Amino acid sequence: CDAQSLGEDDMILMDLKYKDRVGEIHRTRYNPDHRWVYFPQMTPDEVILLKCYDTERDGRARWTAHTAFDDPTSPPNASPRQSIETRTIAFYDD
């Protein structure tokens, strides 16, 4: 989702329950003003990098709402999507 179309009120903080602990996660509230982007023709050598969270509140994007869905136009024998998720913390001087 285009971060410029995502308001603070669109993000809902919820508990993320594990067997041994409880964490937190943001869920996205529906808003007809959201501008979603879809990349149906990606090749195996292409990637998308998402900024999932930033503590700064200076006008830069703080997060990117993202999702997956079953594409009804996919051929029945299409290979399933493969994803790699990494969580990286970057510290830098301004």
Please name every model-derived segment:
Residues H26-D94:
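Catalytic core of Fe(II)/2-oxoglutarate
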Residues L16-T28:
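Short, basic/aromatic beta-hairpin or loop at an interaction surface
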Residues C1-D15:
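Extended boundary segments
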